[in-house]
């Protein structure tokens, strides 16, 4: 019974999975908007690191939780079929960026290519996949949101220090704190909400 209550609480506290995906999109796009050609190399590198970590976590969450659920209910799988290949191309560009020095003339070009790919991917999801999910999934949206929150905690924890370091060392402004910290804040607040209700793993 306690497990059932905990699951109900989790679903109630968590945003729907579609809203979580939109929040992820907003956070990474905010990071993109901070990138300028005349930024210092250190600032560029930190921005790119922040965006890349957020994208990797986001892509893994979608592939493990959202896409499998959508494959069951979607009537038009064309966007789904290209989503994972688009993620893989994104990962290829991320690997290139990580291997480059920010002074490399190709660094800006590669990040701009990543930005274009992500913007196209976001447009497909927000105009096709997410509205379809909201039409056909009903209460499953909150359940999947709770699943994504739990998995996000697991994926984010090992990289929290790196995200915080990139943010606090280079971007003391509120906009960058929001951009880099959106993933961390969502998972932290969800965890605190569970603790505040007194439901621990030991119960």
Where are these regions (language model features)?
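Small-residue-biased structural context
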Residues: 1-203
